[in-house]
Design a protein with these regions (language model features):
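Short glycine-rich anion-binding loops that position phosphate/pyrophosphate groups of nucleotides
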Residues: 14-16, 56, 77, 106-109
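Conserved alpha/beta core of the MobA/IspD/sugar-nucleotide pyrophosphorylase nucleotidyltransferase superfamily
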Residues: 1-8, 157-204
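N-terminal glycine-rich phosphate-binding loop and ensuing alpha1 helix
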Residues: 3-55
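Conserved beta-loop-beta/alpha segment of the NTase-like Rossmann-fold superfamily
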Residues: 78-149, 153
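Short beta->alpha connector loops at strand-helix junctions that form conserved
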Residues: 30, 72-77, 178-179
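Conserved beta-strand segments of alpha/beta enzyme cores
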Residues: 25, 48, 70, 174-176, ...
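Conserved N-terminal catalytic core of the sugar/cofactor nucleotidyltransferase
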Residues: 36-100, 114
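Residue-level signal for inorganic ion chemistry
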Residues: 10, 23, 35, 88, ...
C-alpha cells in the first residue's frame, strides 16, 4: 500500500434541505456547478481527492466522474454529516495509507487552491495536531479541517449531523488554530437567499 502525506475528503452527500427543493451543489456560478467549482480548486493540489455522495444520486456523480476524484457512495446519507465522514474514512483506509486527511464540505464557493495550500503548509508545521482555520479576531471556525492519521479510527465511529466537531472539542489541546483574515474558509451557502445575496455581492 502506497503511503501518502495527505489526502482530501470532500463531503457532498448532504440533502440541501434548506434550499427548499434545489440542490445547492448543482447551483451554477459563472456557468459551473458548485460541486465542480470547488473540485477544480482541490484537484489543482495534485494529491488524492475523494468525494462522498448519496448512493442514490446521479447528477452529482455524473459531474464528479468527469474528474480525477474518487467517488465514495454513502448509503443512508440522511443520517448526517458524521455518518458520511465515517463512511468516507472507512472506504479510504481500506485502500490507501494516508498520514493525514483534510475534510471539507462542498458548499464553500470562495475557497481556492491557494487558501487550501496555505492551511496544509501550516498543518505540516505540527503534523501530529488537528489543524483548522479560525477567523482572526473572532471565534468563527471554518474548513477544511486536517486530521492526522491517529484520529482516523475515531472519525470512522462518528454519527449524527455534528460532523467531526465532537472529536475536535474532545481534543482541544491537540488543535492547532490557523488564525486568518481569509473569509473563504468560513462562507458557506445553505439557503436560496444566501446564494442570491452572495451572487449580488460577487457580481457587484
Amino acid at each position: 500500500m502506497i503511503k501518502y502525506k495527505i489526502g482530501f475528503l470532500l463531503l457532498a452527500a448532504g440533502s440541501s434541505s434548506r434550499m427548499r427543493g434545489k440542490d445547492k451543489l448543482l447551483q451554477e456560478i459563472d456557468g459551473v456547478p458548485q460541486i465542480e467549482r470547488i473540485l477544480r480548486q482541490v484537484l489543482k493540489l495534485r494529491f488524492p481527492v475523494f468525494v462522498t455522495v448519496p448512493a442514490t444520486d446521479t447528477k452529482r456523480k455524473s459531474i464528479i466522474s468527469k474528474t480525477k476524484a474518487t467517488i465514495i457512495e454513502v448509503h443512508n446519507s440522511k443520517l448526517g454529516m458524521g455518518h458520511s465522514i465515517a463512511e468516507g474514512i472507512g472506504e479510504i483506509t481500506k485502500n490507501y495509507d494516508f498520514l493525514s486527511l483534510a475534510i471539507c464540505p462542498s458548499d464553500l464557493p470562495d475557497l481556492k487552491m491557494g487558501s487550501i495550500n496555505h492551511l496544509i503548509n501550516y498543518f505540516f508545521k505540527s503534523p501530529e495536531m488537528i489543524c483548522r482555520p479560525v477567523a482572526r479576531g473572532s471565534a468563527n471556525v471554518g474548513h477544511p479541517v486536517i486530521f492526522p492519521k491517529k484520529y482516523f479510527e475515531e472519525l470512522k465511529s462518528i454519527r449524527g449531523d455534528s460532523g467531526a466537531r465532537n472529536i475536535v472539542q474532545k481534543n482541544k489541546t491537540a488543535v492547532n488554530q490557523y488564525n486568518t483574515y481569509d473569509a473563504s474558509y468560513f462562507l458557506d451557502l445553505d439557503t436560496p437567499e444566501e446564494f442570491t445575496n452572495w451572487m449580488k455581492r460577487t457580481n457587484g
